[in-house]
Amino acid sequence: HIETVQKIFKELYDKGYIYKGEYKGKYCTPCESFWTESQLIDGKCPECGREVTEAKEEAYFFKMSPFADRIEKLLTETDYLQPKTRAVELVNNFIKPGLEDLCVSRTTFKWGIPVTFDEKHIVYVWIDALSNYISALGYKNEKFDEFDKYWPADVHMVAKDIMRFHAIIWPAMLMALDLPLPKHLAVHGWITFNGQKMSKSLGNVVDPFVLGERYGADAIRYHIMREMALGADSSFSNEIMINRINSDLANGLGNLVSRTVAMVQKYFGGTLPTERESGEFDDDLIETATSLRAKVDDFMDKTQLQNALAEIFKLVSRANKYIDETAPWVIAKDETKKARLATVLYNLLEAIRIACTLLSAFMPTTMPKALEQIGA
């Protein structure tokens, strides 16, 4: 990582995108830190609470303005940023007022990656931290290079509080390096607790390890993705989670699998005969099942995980309804309708197979077990 960051910094400097200038700001002498006006608390250092003074520091800057038009078009004219509603916020707040050049080095501290051609300067957070995404893949590293194999990323997912860094600064860096951008930038909201932001001081932080031990990681993963729409905050509560797990996973999918497997075992000893006989209600279930993958693919491409899961559970609900409509236990009483009974159960098994296969992306531990139950 260190070597890659130094090479990136030098390349940007050689291309004329990085230049030496002067950084001005509020300086805290005890903390040896510069702060912006907005970072101060009551005009004082946000870390130690002491007075700050106006100070200047020699620094290197990264030119942002050459990329303003390209980034604005990227955000407003393509599907790069998801959800799209975030684009207006970024353009109005940061691009329209004019992108300021970015301070990318400091001399007031020594911990960090030194600039190779001016070692009193330490590479500041932007080029250091953001470069992790490509340094980890071996970018500009002769000994280890997986970069071409894995870059560009299909989806780069970040939280809303760091959206600006990844929607404006990171694309500008990549453009300056003549590297492809991630195909999509997905911005998610925060998980709140009963509508409040989680905070240790409030004692409302949810421990995912405790939840995982109690309900299973797959169930927690499912609940979060089912309840959280991309870009919006989601309120977590034990009551909502338990209701969702019970209604969808236990009563919905779990009940469908157990009823179907039990009937296949009871009426055919666990193996269906090959004879088939179509009947009423088949077409609607088959259409719901066969059209599902394309719908889920579309939602997944848009990073709309909540909608993808909702679509899958439409099939689960339709299959449960199909059981009530066809009443296999009634058909089983007529020995001449073995083919019809086998068809009904086959349709149910196929619906389960499709639903569980698509759900495997969300619940990778549980769904293979469900597929094993039906012999898939």
Give, region by region, the residue ranges found by the protein language model.
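N-terminal Rossmann-like or analogous alpha/beta NTP/dinucleotide-binding catalytic cores
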Residues: H1-I18, E32, M173
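Structured secondary-structure scaffolds
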Residues: E3-T4, P30, C48, E54-K266, ...
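The −1 position to Zn-ligating cysteines in a subset of zinc-ribbon hairpins
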Residues: E11, Y27, K44, L102
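Helix-rich, typically C-terminal accessory recognition domains appended to large enzymatic cores
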Residues: K20, E227, I240-E277, T288-A376
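Flanking scaffold residues of small Cys/His-coordinated metal-binding clusters
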Residues: E22-Y23, L40, A59
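Short, conserved phosphate-binding/catalytic loop or strand-edge motifs used
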Residues: G25-C31
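Cys/His-rich microdomains that often coordinate metals
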Residues: W35, V52
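Cysteine-rich micro-motifs
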Residues: I41-R50
